[in-house]
């Protein structure tokens, strides 16, 4: 009887700890359990290990970013230095603190035309950071029902279809976007997203001296590898990131935040 009661007590403590852990999860963030994945070219690549981390459920919206620039004037359209954001910064906004006549249509949509510098500043002011390329790609492998949908051709076909479409006049609200296994919305089919180390996107081996991947991607053998749907989709993202500079602002490039645990 004593042992039975002790077992129940231990079980109850475990449940309470689990509930407490769930309660302490930051609002609108989810836990992405760590693991390994193979970027780009399947067996030709070195597996990358990703630690468990937290990630925002949604990309940052125009309304959220408006609150940020209201609090931090240095990131307003008229005040930001060109070193930190080019001339297209917040291009669709009507002014420093106005989303314009279409505010109702875009307030809950992803903020775009933001630079890496401004995205990084936003996340840091929330006590967070941008996700690394490795974390973002790992989380983006998830379909609606699988943490790793690397072998699901239909899942990757959806990505290709999105990449082939022109930008819509108005991006949809973030809550109406595709929701994956982790509960993350819009990882595919909404906007491109800034990552912490975007400028190292083309180097995926364990050593930064490993430059063979660059040749694979952009030379003859790269085109052969891209015939695999999932490789082509990842290639599109890596190629896009490699074209960016930290002060660039692009019409379909937004961001979300992450956090180490």
Could you describe each region identified by the protein language model?
Residues 2-3, 17-134, 141, 242-261:
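Extended beta-strand/loop cores of jelly-roll/beta-sandwich
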Residues 32, 97-238, 246-249:
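Functional-site microenvironments in short loops/helix caps that host divalent-cation chemistry
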Residues 6-14:
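Sec-dependent N-terminal signal peptides
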Residues 16-17, 205:
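Hydrophobic alpha-helical membrane context
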């Amino acid at each position: 009887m004593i042992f039975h009661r002790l077992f129940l007590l231990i079980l109850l403590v475990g449940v309470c700890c689990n509930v407490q852990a769930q309660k302490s999860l930051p609002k609108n963030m989810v836990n992405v359990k760590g693991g390994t994945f193979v970027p780009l070219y399947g067996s030709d690549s070195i597996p990358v290990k990703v630690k468990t981390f937290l990630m925002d459920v949604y990309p940052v919206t125009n309304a959220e970013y408006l609150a940020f620039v209201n609090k931090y004037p240095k990131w307003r359209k008229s005040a930001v230095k060109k070193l930190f954001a080019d001339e297209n910064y917040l291009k669709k906004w009507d002014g420093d603190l106005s989303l314009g006549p279409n505010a109702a249509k875009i307030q809950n949509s992803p903020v775009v035309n933001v630079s890496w510098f401004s995205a990084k500043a936003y996340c840091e002011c929330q006590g967070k950071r941008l996700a690394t390329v490795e974390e973002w790609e790992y989380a983006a492998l998830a379909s609606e029902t699988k943490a790793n949908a690397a072998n699901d051709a239909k899942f990757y076909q959806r990505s290709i279809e999105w990449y082939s479409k022109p930008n819509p006049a108005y991006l949809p609200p973030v809550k109406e976007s595709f929701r994956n296994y982790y509960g993350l919305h819009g990882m595919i089919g909404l906007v491109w997203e800034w990552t912490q180390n975007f400028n190292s996107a083309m180097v995926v081996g364990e050593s930064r001296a490993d430059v063979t991947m660059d040749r694979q991607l952009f030379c003859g053998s790269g085109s052969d590898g891209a015939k695999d749907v999932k490789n082509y989709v990842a290639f599109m993202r890596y190629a896009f990131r490699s074209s960016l500079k930290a002060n660039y602002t692009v019409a379909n490039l937004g961001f979300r935040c992450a956090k180490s645990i």
